[in-house]
């Protein structure tokens, strides 16, 4: 066993000197077990002079210089396979729920590995129905694709991800992995209990490295979840759903330790290796000939600035983006998805079909024209518009409200039952609005409803 001693402690970063010149490899896990301290470190740099610089996976409180350190000889390894389902883990793959330890004979895989080779990748394109109108119509998700939910603080990223878990995980019936990266422990706890109540937990593995954890854990916990998902894809040929909330915290944790590791900061103080780290993670989240990983990632946008290097780097890796907009939350439109800024490479006639494509484009054109007219309305009022433009505004407002709907996961707050709307229903509803079939119905009848039939019902109640 290769042993060394702690020579320097700088918060979450620890320097270890090994005698005899036998240094552990980069990414190897080192272990410290002494009195109260039980700590795992990951090798980040070789400094020369027989010394390595490491990042701690839990708090370094109580650690002193001179403490003995063991090299485990391999990267952090976490349990994989069916034993992980229904359980909750930390970054090291240790069970943190109340159901006891994971048996020692369960297979463990290292969290660092190469992305699949180019010839192994799958090129199939198939739409994943979410039951959320604005997503299915304007920025449809691809099965086996990468999806980003972008938004600032408090615009509903976590609620949207929970609704997607509720809709897709239950409809899909396959295996899901949830990685909670640097978010609120309360939300993780709520999600665990919701999933337990609905029974989805039996087919889900959950991994958490929350806000209160040191940056080492927050930086690596996404890889822990990904390793579990990769096993189901590669060894069992499953179609896996991987939820990551929040991928920005992965970058943020990297920037916290970057300066302590002695690297020069780059733009906005981020680590110079930002694009590389993001690429190493994202390239592993992919679909192969054996199975698929569909990943849905929440992306926090600092100060609502989409040009910030963290969200800007994430954009490049995604197949579909769902952009959440604070302006819409202020109007009471939930989910607050911006229909003009959200994108998907699946929105083409070859993939979604001619009718769906035409309806989606007409919806976007109507909303874009309404946006352009808003300045005129603000200055001169509605009366100065031409009859044609008045009709555009009239329909655009109905479309805007019809893009909202109630969520199952928000039922306890709103008191309204959630709705799941199939894609065909969604396309039919918007087509009827564009054709003017519902021009005579009051605007408020379109707000927070499911299908177009619900709108007609609401209108009858309002007019009664």
Curated annotation (Swiss-Prot):
Any GO CC annotation of this UniProt entry: proton-transporting ATP synthase complex
Transmembrane regions listed in the UniProt entry: none
GO molecular function: ATP binding; ATP hydrolysis activity; proton-transporting ATP synthase activity, rotational mechanism
First-level EC class: translocase
Catalytic activity: ATP + H2O + 4 H(+)(in) = ADP + phosphate + 5 H(+)(out)
Keyword line: ATP synthesis, ATP-binding, Cell membrane, CF(1), Hydrogen ion transport, Ion transport, Membrane, Nucleotide-binding, Translocase, Transport
InterPro entries: AAA+_ATPase, ATP-synt_VA_C, ATP_synth_F1_bsu, ATPase_a/bsu_AS, ATPase_alpha/beta_chains, ATPase_F1/V1/A1_a/bsu_N, ATPase_F1/V1/A1_a/bsu_N_sf, ATPase_F1/V1/A1_a/bsu_nucl-bd
Binding annotation for ATP: 151-158
EC number(s) per entry: 7.1.2.2
Entry-linked Pfam families: ATP-synt_ab, ATP-synt_ab_N, ATP-synt_VA_C
Compartments, as annotated in UniProt: Cell membrane
Membrane topology recorded in Swiss-Prot or TrEMBL: Peripheral membrane protein
Primary localization: membrane
Oligomeric form and interacting partners: F-type ATPases have 2 components, CF(1) - the catalytic core - and CF(0) - the membrane proton channel. CF(1) has five subunits: alpha(3), beta(3), gamma(1), delta(1), epsilon(1). CF(0) has three main subunits: a(1), b(2) and c(9-12). The alpha and beta chains form an alternating ring which encloses part of the gamma chain. CF(1) is attached to CF(0) by a central stalk formed by the gamma and epsilon chains, while a peripheral stalk is formed by the delta and b chains.
Cited function: Produces ATP from ADP in the presence of a proton gradient across the membrane. The catalytic sites are hosted primarily by the beta subunits.
Family affiliation: Belongs to the ATPase alpha/beta chains family.
Name used for this protein in its record: ATP synthase subunit beta
Organism encoding this protein: Bacillus cytotoxicus (strain DSM 22905 / CIP 110041 / 391-98 / NVH 391-98)
Gene name of the record: atpD
